[in-house]
Design a protein with these regions (language model features):
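Structural motif
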Residues: 70, 116-117, 147
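Short, low-complexity N-terminal intrinsically disordered segments enriched in polar/charged residues
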Residues: 17-67
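Hydrophobic pocket/interface hotspot
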Residues: 52, 64-65, 73-74, 89, ...
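Short beta-strand edge/turn micro-motifs at domain boundaries
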Residues: 18, 22-23, 137-160
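A mature extracytoplasmic/lumenal domain signature
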Residues: 69, 80, 112, 126-127, ...
Length: 160
């Protein structure tokens, strides 16, 4: 329970930093354009996550990691603490999920996608792993950023 409380506190802290007031003074036409763009952004983010589900479920961890920024600036926070960098995150996944039996089949349930600023969104949801070695599940909060036209995860906080 302590880990779960910690996870929810971390998620709440990140959520409280999000500025949701960025559309309050827009004209109706500007709001409609923003909403259309936001719908397109959200669809693109969900596509990245669907591609990740497929790659993970094929034990293609490199393919799964295509959804993350390939940079030392990537931050992943989970039960093992803070991991910095794309390569270290991949190495941790390979160590923890070396075979299809360990990686299993991944399913995401997205509960919310909210705009932080023009090129960033946070996504809150749940993950489910159906595995031969026993199922696993948990919650996550990830931050996507549009980098050169591609949506990439720049921060991931997952609790299982």
């Amino acid at each position: 329970f302590a880990l779960l409380r910690f996870c929810f506190k971390a998620v709440f802290s990140l959520w409280s930093c999000a500025d949701k007031s960025n559309q309050t003074n827009l004209a109706p036409q500007e709001k409609a354009q923003t909403q259309n763009t936001e719908a397109q952004d959200k669809a693109a983010i969900l596509k990245v996550m669907k591609d990740q589900e497929i790659a993970w479920s094929n034990n293609d961890l490199e393919g799964f990691m295509k959804g993350y920024i390939k940079s030392d600036s990537l931050k992943f926070y989970g039960k093992g603490g803070l991991t910095k960098g794309w390569q270290q995150t991949l190495d941790n996944y390979k160590k923890g999920y070396p075979t299809k039996q360990q990686s299993g089949t991944l399913t995401f349930t997205v509960n919310d996608i909210s705009k932080i600023e023009n090129d960033s969104y946070w996504v809150m949801g749940e993950y489910f792993l159906s595995r031969e070695v026993g199922d696993a599940n948990g919650v996550f909060m990830i931050i996507f950023k549009n980098i050169l036209g591609s949506w990439k995860i720049v921060a991931d906080m997952s609790c299982g």
